[in-house]
Amino acid sequence: MTATDGPAQDRRPGAVLVTGGASGLGAAVALAVRDAGGRPFVLDLVSPSSEVDHELVDLADRGAAAAAVGRAAERMGRLDGVVTAAGVDACGPLGSVPADAWERVVAVNLLGTAAVVRAALPHLERTAGKVVTVASTLGLRALPDATAYCASKFGVVGFTRALAAETAGRVGVTLLVPGGMHTAFFDGRPEQYKPAADAKLNRPEDVAQAVLFALCQPPGCEARELLVAPSTESSWP
């Protein structure tokens, strides 16, 4: 099978690895891939509620993340796409957030993204596949009490732009910059760090359609950057 055969050519998503696919945007992406005729494979700390192939892994563990990618590719027989939707946060002033919690945000959001993509690249190069990284509007604009999250997501932005230049002509790379969404991401935060009760946030299912759009572009055609935010997004511009 050549790089232009199969799912990429008929504009279906194919075999897609989704990190953080047990909840939120990742879960919505996994279902969107399945509904579009693709085969999602989820990597997460917990099992997804939907019946999709998955493996439990802590993406902060570089070796475990890379090994999980290899097993996923072996089980699916190929990789046509990777979506790095896993993400955590630790809100609060820099001096108040425990160092371990702060560093875990960077380990999962940035280093975990790099570990997964690094392990997936050889498989994606064989299929002219796609990478969609998930940053945030807080990867473009900084807010107080969000040093860990901003550091990780600004890092994802830079990583993705450099990756796109590095793999041009071999792997399609898309940077997704989502605004606020109705997910469990904000659960457990102190009230001052939660969206207001009347906040107008996007549905993850709608944002997942933007991811699907990027995944289904033919080789040589790339959606390099997608910013998908509520029309009243407070963190953008």
Task: Locate each region found by the language model.
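Canonical Rossmann dinucleotide-binding motif of NAD(H)/NADP(H)-dependent dehydrogenases/reductases
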Residues: 3, 7-41
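The beta1-alpha1 cofactor-binding region of Rossmann-like NAD(H)/NADP(H)-dependent oxidoreductases
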Residues: 57-67, 99
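Conserved NAD(P)H cofactor-binding loop of Rossmann-fold oxidoreductase domains
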Residues: 85-90
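Substrate-binding pocket helix/loop in short-chain dehydrogenase/reductase
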Residues: 93-94, 101-103
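Active-site helix of classical SDR
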Residues: 117, 152
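Residue(s) in the substrate-gating loop at a strand-loop-helix junction
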Residues: 136
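C-terminal helical subdomain
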Residues: 169, 175-176, 195-236
